[in-house]
């Protein structure tokens, strides 16, 4: 096992002897992880070749890697977990990373202090879509969490300062203080960690010359470094598992968790896991995923952006499948409505022990920063969205900023129940009609305004990613300076879905549903390559001209041109690539546009030739 540069020494507090021993043990799963990802790409390629939609599993089949029959999983004939006390009430879970790009430890610890003093019932500290990956940010993230969970004196000093700052804001915005006894309040919020998905490689570690799975690294570093402190505090070890596409992949995660528990001498099922349902294929296998994770599984989360992206990508072969403006694809829209309904039915199907699971609702991306009118309008919409999810059966939801906790949490507080476990819903169906509902399109606008929004935010997000800001407050450039239009806190998913929809519109001959005075285009005009090129030039020019508060001045000659090159290549190529993040990852810490273009071409050529995604860190790859 090789750790690049001097990181083993610089992060000796993270790469401890115990961690290194566990990594060496867990690295035994690396080949299986790579095989699973090869199978994932082949399933996708076969569907595209055969123009075949995703379907339900054969009820008589076995879930790969397990001895569980599909029909038994659907019938609840498996042993699941009881929900531990500190997850029984999770009305609001905040989300965000525990590190900032190129920041001192004290600065990053402020992120953790804001989170743990926010009053959220849980906080998902992100190692995935919201965590920048420049330099050694994944290790900075782990360091912050270890210091905070262990209640290091430096963290406690920072937390005391942050408590006062939070009260200053809350007195002005809420008319009251939200932190009374800050030391006691640190123990209120359940600490949760999201690992990177199986589709990503770690940027720092190689085993026998091959990159080690980022999922294996994140899982091992977090659990080994923190399980003793969490257990001593009476807290659960809780993870979010992202981007799972199949029950077979869930079974692999289950084996990872069980193996690490065994290595550490922990009882089977000590580690608890939520699964983010952000992939269309997973929605066809919800009960199977529950069963495959067994004693580790506690609940599902319904995202929005990543899920829309997965539906778009899974139907890239179908010329009739064209999404409307992204703003129209709400949780009540066509396929999203049916997706949410299947999740709530799945968690409320009892297992063999009579246990139900949790449904954690989707993300609220609004931030209460802007004009008085803009904030009031956005907060009304945010509360209405939370009220809808609570009515539909969610036991809680996510917020993207600590300030939103006290705006959204009262929705569940007023409802009163700790959770909605066991709320009765009709049983899941597995008919052709049920399958069709999961890709149901409904009429919606498809406009130049919508295209500009897609492009502007996709470019800005790619730029932010290159700067190490995978969680970024964004809005389309046309609304810069308009405080009535609020910024939304976005992560990698926002870039993925925007490029997928632009690719759909361009390569499937999407037509506009409204006249556009600025371009002179009429209803029925086709979204052509020439139109895309024009909009790309115009939206890029707006970002170059933007104030440094919206687009960092230094990025305009470094990471922004690379973001443009990636967006242009991804959207215009007739081949639909599975991940925007792949092309961004290949260019982390790179500001050379020519090198970026060469890497983009190399990735695309490799994918077209062999179906292989280049996911390793090219800066440290053998032979480069």
Predicted ranges, named:
Residues 1-29, 36, 52, 57-78, ...:
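Conserved alpha/beta-domain cores
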Residues 32, 36, 40-50:
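Subunit-assembly interface segments of extracellular/virion macromolecular structures
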């Amino acid at each position: 096992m090789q750790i690049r540069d001097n990181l083993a020494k610089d992060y000796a507090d993270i790469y401890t002897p115990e961690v290194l021993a566990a990594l060496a043990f867990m690295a035994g799963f690396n080949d299986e992880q790579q095989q699973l990802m090869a199978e994932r790409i082949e399933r996708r390629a076969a569907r595209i070749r055969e123009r075949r939609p995703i379907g339900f599993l054969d009820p008589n089949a076995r879930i790969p890697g397990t001895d569980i029959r599909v029909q038994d999983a659907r019938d609840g004939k498996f042993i699941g977990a009881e929900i531990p006390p500190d997850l029984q009430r999770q009305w609001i879970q905040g989300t965000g990373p525990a590190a900032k790009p190129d920041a001192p430890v004290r600065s990053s610890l402020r992120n953790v202090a804001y989170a743990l003093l926010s009053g959220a019932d849980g906080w998902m500290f992100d190692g995935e879509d919201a965590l920048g990956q420049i330099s050694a940010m994944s290790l900075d993230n782990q360091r912050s969490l270890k210091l905070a969970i262990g209640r290091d004196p430096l963290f406690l000093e920072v937390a005391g300062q942050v408590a006062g700052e939070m009260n200053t804001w809350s007195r002005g915005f809420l008319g009251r203080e939200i932190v009374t006894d800050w030391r006691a309040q640190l123990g209120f919020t359940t600490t949760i960690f999201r690992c990177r998905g199986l589709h990503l490689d770690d940027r720092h570690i190689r085993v026998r010359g091959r990159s080690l799975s980022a999922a294996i690294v994140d899982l091992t570093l977090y659990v080994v470094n923190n399980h003793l402190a969490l257990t001593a505090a009476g807290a659960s070890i809780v993870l979010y598992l992202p981007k799972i596409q199949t029950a077979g992949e869930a079974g692999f995660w289950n084996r990872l968790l069980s193996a690490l528990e065994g290595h550490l001498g922990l009882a089977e099922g000590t580690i608890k896991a939520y699964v983010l349902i952000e992939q269309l294929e997973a929605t066809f296998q919800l009960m199977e995923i529950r069963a495959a994770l067994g004693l580790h599984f506690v609940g599902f989360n319904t995202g929005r952006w990543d899920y829309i992206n997965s539906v778009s990508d899974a139907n890239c072969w179908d010329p009739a499948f064209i999404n409307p403006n992204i703003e129209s694809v709400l949780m009540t829209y066509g396929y999203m409505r049916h997706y949410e309904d299947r999740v709530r039915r799945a968690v409320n199907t009892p297992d063999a022990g009579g246990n139900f699971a949790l449904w954690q609702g989707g993300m609220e991306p609004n931030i209460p920063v802007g004009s008085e009118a803009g904030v009031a309008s956005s907060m009304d919409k945010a509360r209405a969205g939370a009220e809808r999810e609570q009515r539909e059966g969610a036991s809680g939801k996510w917020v993207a900023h600590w300030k939103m906790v006290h705006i959204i949490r009262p929705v569940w507080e007023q409802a009163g129940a700790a959770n909605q476990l066991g709320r009765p819903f009709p049983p899941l169906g597995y008919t052709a009609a049920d399958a069709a509902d999961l890709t149901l399109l409904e009429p919606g606008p498809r406009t130049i305004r919508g295209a500009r929004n897609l492009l502007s935010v996709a470019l800005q997000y790619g730029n932010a990613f290159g700067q190490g800001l995978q969680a970024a407050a964004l809005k389309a450039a046309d609304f810069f300076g308009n405080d009535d239009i609020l910024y939304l806190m976005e992560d990698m998913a926002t870039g993925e879905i925007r490029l997928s929809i632009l690719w759909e519109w361009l390569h499937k001959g999407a037509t506009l549903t409204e006249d556009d005075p600025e371009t002179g285009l009429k209803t029925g005009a086709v979204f052509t390559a020439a139109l895309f090129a024009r909009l790309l030039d115009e939206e890029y020019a707006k970002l170059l001209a933007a104030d440094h508060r919206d687009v960092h001045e230094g990025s305009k000659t470094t990471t922004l041109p690379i973001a443009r090159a990636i967006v242009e290549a991804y959207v215009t190529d007739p081949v639909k690539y599975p991940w925007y993040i792949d092309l961004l990852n290949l260019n982390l810490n790179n500001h050379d546009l020519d090198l970026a273009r060469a890497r983009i071409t190399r990735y695309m050529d490799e994918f077209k030739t062999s179906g292989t995604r280049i996911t390793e860190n090219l800066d440290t790859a053998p032979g480069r």
